[in-house]
Amino acid sequence: MQQYPDVRQHRPFGYWVKEIDRRIEEMGRRVLAEHGLDRRLWQVLNTIASGPIGPDDLDRALAPFLSADEPTLRPYVDDLARRGWVSRSGEGDLTLTDAGRDAYARARERMYAARARVVEGLSPEDYDTLMDLLERIAGNLGAEVAA
């Protein structure tokens, strides 16, 4: 029979997963707000920064984040275009303007610095082990849900 740690001495696994998620979300929200962005605007900006992309391809690339209430990212593209950060080619492809590239670079630098703080103190081996364990746990849960 599996032995479980005494929750009076160690908080349960689910507590830490939720707490880490909450803290990462809050950190990202604060960093992006410094640049006038929210998570969805950042995802759109980050995707367009990878190279020209059509609006339909952008929706497909970020489809996991869309819903019946939010079926397209066009309102976010329009917001970025109003800021002068995104332009549309004659074919409709979206690209970052010079101002958009500058804004993206500033936000990206802050996001990367924040992400580095998340894993500060972990060796590359620790990080690889953590990622492997989380992936295996997710796989276990996926198998359990499918059963």
Predicted segments with their positions:
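N-terminal leader segment of winged-helix/HTH proteins
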Residues: M1-R39
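Charged, amphipathic alpha-helical coiled-coil/dimerization segments
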Residues: D78-D132
